[in-house]
């Protein structure tokens, strides 16, 4: 065996690996610095240093950013009307010329004004909201609304499993296709990894349209696996909408290994449907290879039915956005709280500024309550969540671990006045990497319903104390330390 030759090959590979690492480090530090937080940059440099070649491969799958141009393709001049609406609302707030009937709109005008800096986050009024915390009740209503649809049905989901629940919904959609309705389904290619377009052959033969978000172009390999569409929305006839945390699948009915699935979702009616419809059209056009999905008037009809009193903004965020509106909205709400804060999130891995905001609120006398799962669905994420939550104990934050199955709810509510419900977790992935959508709701009734639901959850939770946390074994401390170190890339 020619060991000299093998040594030469090994040397060449090491040199190539070193040069590749240096180039990639240069890209991360300088060329993508505007799209990354400092913690993310350091985390990736750590991975490259510890795992020179493997780190490069991981970066190809997990580290690349998303082009804003790609996400805004096919929309042309269609957005001008919404941009004008947002600018008019900004002007009215700047001139203190409100004209709104909802007291919470005036009281929290600073939050509203901030969210308006993204063109799809226009303020809507006269909205009716129904709250769901149980998957069975939610999807009974969803199926009823689908069967009652008259014109079109649009669905966008991170996970759309074709199991018992998924097949029931697909059957309902195919029934409406036979009646001549328009049906569009956008699912995430990684979140719905068991599903392929070929599974929708009959659905498409009936005239249904289906698209996968950032699909893999190479079998078993997806170079966009770290930037996923985590949104969960439905629009029916431009009159009814759904937004929240529930995906489609039997797991979300409590039939999976994690047991009972506790989540939060809303059914909405009113002006807010136009905002959900806009979000769907933008996302569909970013992925579809078909002719542009037009902003036809039929998708933004005059609203009928009972009017509610809630004001709502639909805020979106994602790696192609200049502003992280949901993260900003969460932080602004926390800093605005005067009496109480209620938080639920399955994954709690925010940056230090978010942690500090909660500490400052608690140290200022605000009652801060955080609820997280007692069991992991992703081990590293779980330990990072636990470690971050425990950091708040010294400030007097109440930390609850939910015991009755798995809590997947993503809500923030302050002062029994305003709340946020949607797909975004309180973590780096939701704030920086995934495409998310949340409803910021200015309505005391919904806020109080969320508090009541939280208090009911407390009955099935354990309070985490400093005394108990400090007694955790060394193995747990090691897991937490490692998970926290790599949390910016989890």
Curated annotation (Swiss-Prot):
> Which residue range or ranges hold the PLD phosphodiesterase domain?
225-252, 403-430
Active-site residue list: 230, 232, 237, 408, 410, 415
Give the reactions, separated by semicolons, that this protein catalyses.
2 a 1,2-diacyl-sn-glycero-3-phospho-(1'-sn-glycerol) = a cardiolipin + glycerol
Q: Answer yes or no on keyword Lipid metabolism.
A: yes
Q: Membrane: present as a keyword of the record?
A: yes
Protein's cellular compartments: Cell membrane
Question: From the UniProt record, which GO molecular function terms apply?
Answer: cardiolipin synthase activity
Q: Which residues cross the membrane?
A: 9-29, 42-62
Recorded topology in the membrane: Multi-pass membrane protein
Q: Where is it found, in Gene Ontology cellular component terms?
A: plasma membrane
Instruction: Write down the EC number.
Output: 2.7.8.-
Q: Tell me which InterPro entries the record gives.
A: Cardiolipin_synth_Firmi (IPR030874), Cardiolipin_synthase (IPR022924), CLS_N (IPR027379), PLD-like_dom (IPR025202), PLipase_D/transphosphatidylase (IPR001736)
- Write the record's keywords in alphabetical order, separated by commas: Cell membrane, Lipid biosynthesis, Lipid metabolism, Membrane, Phospholipid biosynthesis, Phospholipid metabolism, Repeat, Transferase, Transmembrane, Transmembrane helix
Q: What class of enzyme is it?
A: transferase
What is the documented function of this protein?
Answer: Catalyzes the reversible phosphatidyl group transfer from one phosphatidylglycerol molecule to another to form cardiolipin (CL) (diphosphatidylglycerol) and glycerol.
* Family note: Belongs to the phospholipase D family. Cardiolipin synthase subfamily.
Name assigned to this protein: Cardiolipin synthase 1
Species of provenance: Staphylococcus epidermidis (strain ATCC 35984 / DSM 28319 / BCRC 17069 / CCUG 31568 / BM 3577 / RP62A)
Which gene is transcribed and translated to give this protein?
cls1
